[in-house]
Amino acid sequence: MKDRFYMTRAIKLSKLGEFTTSPNPNVGCVIVQNKKIVGEGWHKKYGENHAEINALNMAGEKAKGSTAYITLEPCNHFGKTPPCCDAIIQSGIKNVIISSLDPNPKVSGKGVLYLRKKGISVKIGLMSKESQKYNKGFFKRMRTGLP
């Protein structure tokens, strides 16, 4: 029940980047420690920090041992920004709950595998339909190549 509460918050945060992140997706992240939100963020603008980094910056040391709720699978490749997976691992987060896998072939399951390989518990699919509706264009573009 609480998982849905935190993911709902992450989805609401993701909507804040609706007109500023293209061609990247809208992503929200909430970090929870002892049933309290200690960090939250969203991808604010293309080329700038992703949601996970903004949430980790807010959480600071409180991220250690926490759970992250993320609307889209974290990246584990270098693009305009460094991999979010590395930052998650370095922060000491123990659990990651992801709403949707990233359909981008550069990511698509690789972020999940990487986090699991590093000992982080990962769950996928919480409120996936709800989060994907705010990224319809991104999902369509990644799956079909069409705008």
Swiss-Prot record:
Domain CMP/dCMP-type deaminase, residue spans: 1-122
**Record: active site:** E52
Q: In which pathway does it act?
A: Cofactor biosynthesis; riboflavin biosynthesis; 5-amino-6-(D-ribitylamino)uracil from GTP: step 2/4
Q: Which GO terms describe its biological process?
A: riboflavin biosynthetic process
Which EC number(s) does the record attach to this protein?
A: 3.5.4.26
**Cofactor(s) listed:** Zn(2+)
Q: What class of enzyme is it?
A: hydrolase
Q: Where does Zn(2+) bind?
A: H50, C75, C84
Protein keywords: Hydrolase, Metal-binding, Riboflavin biosynthesis, Zinc
Q: Which reaction does it catalyse?
A: 2,5-diamino-6-hydroxy-4-(5-phosphoribosylamino)-pyrimidine + H2O + H(+) = 5-amino-6-(5-phospho-D-ribosylamino)uracil + NH4(+)
Pfam families the record matches: dCMP_cyt_deam_1
Nucleus is among the record's keywords: no
A GO MF annotation of the entry reads: zinc ion binding
Cofactor binding note: Binds 1 zinc ion.
Q: Which PROSITE patterns match?
A: CYT_DCMP_DEAMINASES_1 (PS00903), CYT_DCMP_DEAMINASES_2 (PS51747)
Q: Which family does it belong to?
A: Belongs to the cytidine and deoxycytidylate deaminase family.
Q: What is this protein called?
A: Diaminohydroxyphosphoribosylamino-pyrimidine deaminase
The species this protein belongs to is Buchnera aphidicola subsp. Schizaphis graminum (strain Sg)
